[in-house]
């Protein structure tokens, strides 16, 4: 420690070094981005393919399977799922965390190219991919409303103008629009009028397509001039299409308006969107992978004036939902907790030292260490988030520890009559190794966490590095700045001054004397203390097994997502009514601020809702409590269910589910899967540990199955392709022509009039023109009957899959839910052909359970190795680590007391305790070893004196750590559910360990000393016997 004497003799250099650390930290702080949590986004790529009119089974076998075979060969794919519905397939690829998404995207494109020859030739476009997780909640939702413009026109503005501009902004990954579709000219045909005129639907289609043509025409020129040729070959509005002649009947022209209603409408009339019960278009913005939420939202907010200016004055563009306010509020709460923690720690130091000068010395270590850490955070690419700021809050109790130990030892020498400069040199020489051991062993706790793969390792890497850097800076400050300031600020006092025996110090002295008397008794009854230590180890095991567990604390982000699931045969009109009813019920809750939702598209029995709650200061209930009371009201709506779940910052997997947790059934036999899924789902629904149980298996959709009489068709001169074309023209909203405009392209959509789509009897009015040109009714050669058919087909890997989703009732933990599911699956006797496994967050939870004990054990072994190297001993590290069982018991009991489940955040608290509580033992053992090796004291006298002399710094460091964590326990604002488990664990562990380790550590020290003496005497006896 002679090196550090240089800093005592060179105060200017020491001060400038300290200032440099602080200035670098200030600069780093200004450059740090802000986010709710560290970047832990799994690389997810969504591949989409379409084949209009194809059934879900056709899409699954002809499109999804070839794509899955090609995509499944890509390296680093951790999960591959697909959903095939009417005319569309989506394949979701989730990659390992260490996979670069850009490299993965190149592999995905290559796989799509390789599968192209295996896909149906009728696909109008190649499959496309997006680097975005479709299951992620939008970071911002905008709404467009107007009293003058139609929904289709609003959608056009959103798609043509807003979407393009927003997509170009930094951080934006995907912009999706819901609530309607692009404008279109819709041709609603009257099949009876067509039959009377002898005109087929296909003839109408061809006439429209031939009347609207865009193709190169060329130019004419002479020696002086050139003219381009332009014609009126394009029709752009409904009024232009209506007078179109499509047929001549006995010389009389039959116009389109004679057999159809032509109007300007939308491409897909089966879409609806609403914002607070008012028709609206929803613009849902998702961030790009690894993009910062706050930066992305700020970019969009800054562009809002420009976006509004680009729209007509009659259109209102509003922000319906924004993720950033609760993030900012949560970070403000953490910053407030940090300031309170710093103040409390300094107060603790002042109470013990009773001197402004003496208090200022360790107090300087706190801001310098914390501020200097910001520089390292910036260099490591970290952000200011809940976890990194929690690390700094906890660090306030640690960074002062080393300075306290150095200051207390120097003060003891000054009170003994030594001059301040000499006391500083002697004091730092005596405890330099102690503070080095304390700091290095604390940092060593995080080495296994830094090496840990997967989500927990990535999630808490910033926490571990941030805290470790703060501790190492504090170590540097305590060995440089602290002794230098002690040599110049502390006054030489020949003996303890009278004021130190007053007030708080009198209480402390009485406690120390009482501790000395009780310690003598304990050392004389060491056997009982050892039994107590063994009892705490056993209690640790029992508490860990029995305590409720979860993966990550459920956050209250002020936002809810709702998923509507209605009867599979419901019509679009009825589904729109359900959406309105649900929005009315949700809006009536006093904690709800606004509600937005949409329905329609390829699956008319589903819908989505986005709910913003009032700020936490304006409501007296949590998001989960809002869901619980709404669940009762929503259950009264017949024929449909609305499943609500709070939006979380961590979303695992890419599966779009109606609830927060999933259990997936897999089978190579689709019929077996469809047989067992309802039974399993029904059994899950009866479990009290689960709520909102639902499934993505949609195999009960209403379908009208037509059976062709092929012999009759052959006699009548009718082909199957002609009949299929008839049905597609009549009921498929077929896009038959394209209208080209400067900013976009629009479609001409043809189908029969709505009056003929309301009932199955309309099929009797359909006819086909045979090879002789005669109209033949469909009923002449076809029969039909209603059957059940799937609305979607799901795969995971290459197996048929069905995912059962569920939420947790209020007060239920995830470990109880997963255990109940496993018991139920065992009792049902599910055949081996059907396999079950947890997915998403539930799967990550189960995987983390198997690694938690290994992580704790690895941390203990790492600390043991570091201490063994520092002390050159196998035994003394065990003495120091004997403090851990009591801390574990205190932490687990505190979690039980507060009703908090054991989560990843609590696990980090346990690991922190491994580093914290051993500090007390290090201070005792280090002093005892020095005294014992000097030969002046026996082992018992050495450890007894060490306990008494180190009582004050032990109390100071423990209370500093305790008060540093206390604001996390008492916090109640935004993000409190994330911070409290860490604070509860640390405070509980510190309180219990402080009570027990003051007695168990000296007993264990003497126990190992006696064992060592016995081993030494054994060889001596062997020699004498020989």
From Swiss-Prot:
It is found in: Cell inner membrane. Keywords: Cell inner membrane, Cell membrane, Membrane, Transmembrane, Transmembrane helix, Transport. InterPro entries: AcrB_DN_DC_subdom, Acrflvin-R, Multidrug-R_MdtC. The keyword tRNA processing does not apply. It holds the Pfam family ACR_tran. The keyword Transcription does not apply. GO terms for molecular function: xenobiotic transmembrane transporter activity. The chain crosses the membrane at residues 12-32, 333-353, 360-380, 387-407, 431-451, 463-483, 528-548, 853-873, 875-895, 897-917, 953-973, 984-1004. SUPFAM superfamilies: Multidrug efflux transporter AcrB pore domain, PN1, PN2, PC1 and PC2 subdomains (SSF82693), Multidrug efflux transporter AcrB TolC docking domain, DN and DC subdomains (SSF82714), Multidrug efflux transporter AcrB transmembrane domain (SSF82866). GO terms for cellular component: plasma membrane. It is a multi-pass membrane protein. Part of a tripartite efflux system composed of MdtA, MdtB and MdtC. MdtC forms a heteromultimer with MdtB. This is Multidrug resistance protein MdtC. It comes from Pectobacterium carotovorum subsp. carotovorum (strain PC1).
């Amino acid at each position: 420690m002679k090196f550090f004497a240089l800093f005592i003799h060179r105060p200017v250099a020491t001060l400038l070094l300290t200032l440099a650390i602080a200035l670098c930290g200030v600069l780093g702080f200004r450059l740090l981005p802000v986010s709710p949590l560290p970047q832990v986004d799994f690389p997810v790529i969504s591949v989409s393919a379409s084949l209009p009119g194809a059934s879900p089974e056709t899409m699954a076998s002809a499109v999804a399977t070839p794509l899955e075979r090609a995509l499944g060969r890509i390296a680093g794919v951790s999960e591959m799922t697909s959903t095939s519905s009417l005319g569309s397939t989506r394949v979701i690829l989730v990659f390992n965390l260490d996979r670069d998404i850009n490299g993965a995207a190149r592999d995905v494109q290559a796989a799509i190219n390789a599968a192209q020859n295996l896909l149906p030739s009728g696909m109008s476009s190649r499959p496309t991919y997006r680097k975005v997780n479709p299951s992620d909640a939008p970071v911002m939702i905008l709404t467009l409303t107007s009293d003058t413009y139609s929904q289709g026109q609003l959608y056009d503005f959103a798609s043509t103008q807003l979407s393009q501009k927003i997509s170009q902004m930094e951080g934006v990954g995907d912009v999706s629009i819901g609530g309607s579709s692009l404008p279109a000219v819709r041709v609603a045909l009257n099949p009876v009028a067509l039959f009377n005129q002898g005109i087929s639907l296909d003839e109408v289609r061809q006439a429209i397509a031939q009347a609207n043509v865009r193709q190169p025409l060329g130019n004419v020129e002479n020696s002086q001039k050139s003219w381009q040729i332009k014609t009126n070959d394009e029709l752009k509005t409904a009024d232009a299409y209506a007078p179109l002649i499509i047929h001549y009947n006995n010389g009389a022209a039959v116009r389109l308006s004679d057999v159809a209603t032509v109007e300007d409408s939308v491409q897909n009339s089966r879409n609806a969107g609403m914002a607070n019960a008012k028709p609206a278009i929803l613009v849902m913005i998702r961030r790009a992978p690894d993009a910062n939420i706050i930066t992305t939202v700020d970019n969009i907010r800054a562009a809002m004036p420009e976006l509004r200016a680009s729209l007509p004055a009659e259109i209102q563009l509003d922000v319906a939902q924004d993720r950033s306010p609760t993030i900012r509020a949560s970070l403000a709460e953490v910053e407030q907790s940090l300031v309170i923690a710093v103040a409390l720690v300094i107060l603790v130091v002042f109470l013990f030292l009773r001197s402004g000068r003496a208090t200022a010395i360790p107090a300087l270590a706190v801001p310098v260490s914390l501020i200097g850490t910001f520089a390292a955070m910036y260099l490591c690419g970290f952000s200011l988030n809940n976890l990194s700021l929690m690390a700094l809050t906890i660090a306030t109790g640690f960074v002062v520890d080393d300075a306290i130990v150095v200051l207390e030892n120097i003060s003891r020498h000054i009170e003994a009559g030594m001059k301040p400069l000499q006391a500083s040199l002697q004091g730092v020489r005596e405890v330099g190794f102690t503070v080095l051991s304390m700091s290095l062993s604390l940092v060593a706790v995080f080495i296994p966490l830094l090496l840990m793969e997967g989500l927990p390792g990535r999630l808490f890497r910033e926490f571990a590095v941030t805290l470790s850097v703060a501790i190492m800076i504090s170590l540097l400050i305590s060995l440089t700045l602290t002794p230098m300031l002690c040599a110049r600020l502390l006054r030489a006092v020949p003996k303890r001054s009278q004021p130190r025996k007053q007030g708080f110090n009198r209480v402390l002295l009485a406690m120390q004397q009482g501790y000395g008397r009780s310690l003598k008794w304990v050392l004389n009854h060491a056997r009982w203390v050892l039994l107590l230590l063994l009892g705490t180890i056993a209690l640790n095991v029992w508490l860990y097994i029995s305590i409720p567990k979860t993966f990550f604390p459920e956050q209250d982000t002020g936002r809810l997502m709702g998923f509507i699931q209605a009867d599979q045969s419901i019509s679009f009109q009825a589904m729109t009514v359900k959406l309105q009813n649900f929005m009315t019920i949700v809006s009536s809750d006093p904690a709800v601020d606004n509600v937005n939702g949409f329905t329609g598209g390829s699956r008319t029995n589903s819908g989505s809702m986005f709910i913003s709650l009032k700020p936490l200061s304006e409501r007296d209930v949590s998001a989960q409590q809002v869901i619980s009371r709404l669940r009762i009201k929503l259950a009264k709506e017949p024929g449909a269910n609305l499943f609500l779940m709070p939006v979380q910052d961590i979303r695992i997997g890419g599966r779009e589910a109606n609830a927060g947790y999933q259990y997936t059934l897999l089978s190579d036999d689709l019929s077996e899967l469809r047989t067992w899924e309802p039974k399993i789902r029904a059994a899950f629904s009866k479990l009290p540990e689960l709520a909102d149980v639902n499934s993505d298996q949609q195999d009960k959709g209403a379908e009208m199955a037509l059976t062709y009489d092929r012999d009759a068709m052959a006699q009548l001169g009718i082909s199957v392709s002609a009949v299929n074309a008839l049905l597609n023209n009549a009921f498929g909203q077929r896009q038959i022509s394209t209208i080209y405009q400067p900013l976009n392209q629009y479609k001409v959509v043809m189908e029969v009039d709505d009056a003929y789509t309301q009932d199955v009897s309309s099929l009797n009015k359909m006819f086909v023109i045979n090879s002789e040109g005669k109209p033949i009714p469909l009923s002449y050669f076809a029969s039909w009957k209603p059957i059940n058919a799937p609305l979607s087909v799901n795969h995971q890997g290459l197996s048929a899959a069905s995912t059962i989703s569920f939420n947790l009732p209020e007060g239920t933990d995830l470990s109880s839910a997963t255990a109940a599911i496993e018991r139920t699956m065992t009792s049902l006797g599910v055949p081996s052909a059907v396999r079950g496994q947890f997915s998403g967050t539930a799967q990550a939870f189960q995987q983390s359970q198997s690694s938690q004990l290994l992580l704790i054990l690895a941390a203990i072994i790492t600390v043991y190795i570091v201490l063994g190297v520092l002390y050159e001993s196998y035994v003394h590290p065990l003495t120091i680590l004997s403090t851990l069982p009591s801390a574990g018991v205190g932490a687990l009991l505190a979690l039980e007391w507060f009703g908090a489940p054991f989560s990843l955040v609590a696990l980090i608290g346990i690991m922190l305790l491994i580093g914290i509580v051993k500090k007390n033992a290090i201070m005792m053992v280090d002093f005892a070893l020095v005294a014992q090796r000097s030969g002046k004291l026996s082992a018992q006298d050495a450890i007894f004196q060490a306990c008494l002399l180190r009582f004050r710094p032990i109390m100071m460091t423990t209370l500093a750590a305790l008060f540093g964590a206390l604001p996390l326990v008492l916090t109640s604002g935004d993000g409190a559910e994330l911070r409290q488990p860490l604070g509860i664990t640390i405070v509980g562990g510190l309180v219990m360990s402080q009570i027990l380790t003051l007695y168990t550590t000296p007993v264990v020290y003497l126990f190992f000393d006696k064992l060592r003496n016995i081993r030494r005497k054994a060889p001596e006896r062997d020699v004498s016997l020989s």
